[in-house]
Amino acid sequence: DINFKASYGGLSDNIIQNFYAPVLEESNIYKRSVAYFTGGIFCIATSAYKSFFIDNNGKFQLVTSPFFDEKISDAYKKYEDVFNQEDLTLDVLNKSLEKLENLQHGSDLIEFISILLNLNKLEIKIALVPEPGLYHEKIGIFADSYGNSISFSGSINETWSGWISNSEEFKVFN
């Protein structure tokens, strides 16, 4: 059991260390609904993602607006063009994840996202709303193999800036 505050906010709460990483490490499903998504999110808690994807056989299901960084588009192209399904294993994913330590950008990130897509560990759905609107929900649900879940809702997007450098607020629900 992990104890969490009812809400987190501001830069002083260290939301990666006190919320995101501990929950991710115990989960095998992460469902996220956001306006903005960037691949840099995978670089903020690599050891937690290792537990999630490798140890827990986790799956990340994402719904987002059509506005995401070029690395995601590049990863889709690589996903379609490069990888041979028989060559992809959790060991390949693990080695790719190890390369991400202390990185935020670059070809290692594109490769990692491509592997996630190929292994069906990352599922991205695009939410479209009538113009000039923008899909802008920000909800997250973590679940484990025992049926436990925890959710959160607030201002935070699934981006490096959202989790690391912005002053964001969200509420936690058991």
Describe the residue ranges of each PLM region.
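PLD/PLD-like phosphodiesterase catalytic module centered on the HKD motif
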Residues: 1-174
